[in-house]
Amino acid sequence: MKVLVIIALCFFILQTALSEDKYESFESYVEDLKSGNMKGEARECIPLYNDCKEFKYNNNCCKDPEKKYQYKCSCIMCEGGEEQCTCQRKETVENMMKCVRFVKKVVEKVG
């Protein structure tokens, strides 16, 4: 039962994290994971207001003056080969990466 809840949570996080036009369904995302197509994944990028690419963790967008949350610079590869980075809450980035690793392990065991 716990596994189903974790998979459901991962599904929700992945669906919100992935662009809808890139992946129409979770099944296609899993197929890409199985085939290894995710390594050089490029996405269409949008203009950013909190770009942290140049400074990574030292950028002001990654600092919370009230020290309420920790932020982490999260990057994706754009279609033109350019990297785009934004600051996100550290917990969000780490939870998303845990879900991706979990889904990869499940796919390896099932596939």
Curated annotation (Swiss-Prot):
Record's subcellular location: Secreted
Signal peptide: 1-19
GO molecular function, one term: toxin activity
Cellular component aspect of the GO annotation: extracellular region
Residue positions where Valine amide is found in the record: V110
Membrane spanning stretches: none
Disulfide bridge positions per record: C45-C62, C52-C73, C61-C87, C75-C85, C78-C99
Residue span(s) of the pro-peptide: 20-43
Tissue-level expression: Expressed by the venom gland.
Motif (Processing quadruplet motif): 40-43
Post-translational modification: Contains 5 disulfide bonds. Cleavage of the propeptide depends on the processing quadruplet motif (XXXR, with at least one of X being E).
Major site of localization recorded for this protein: secreted
Keywords associated with the record: Amidation, Disulfide bond, Knottin, Secreted, Signal, Toxin
Domain of life: Eukaryota
Domain note: The presence of a 'disulfide through disulfide knot' structurally defines this protein as a knottin.
Function: Insect toxin.
Family label: Belongs to the neurotoxin 19 (CSTX) family. 11 (latartoxin) subfamily.
Protein name per its UniProtKB record: Latartoxin-2b
UniProt organism field: Lachesana tarabaevi (Spider)
Organism phylogeny: Eukaryota, Metazoa, Ecdysozoa, Arthropoda, Chelicerata
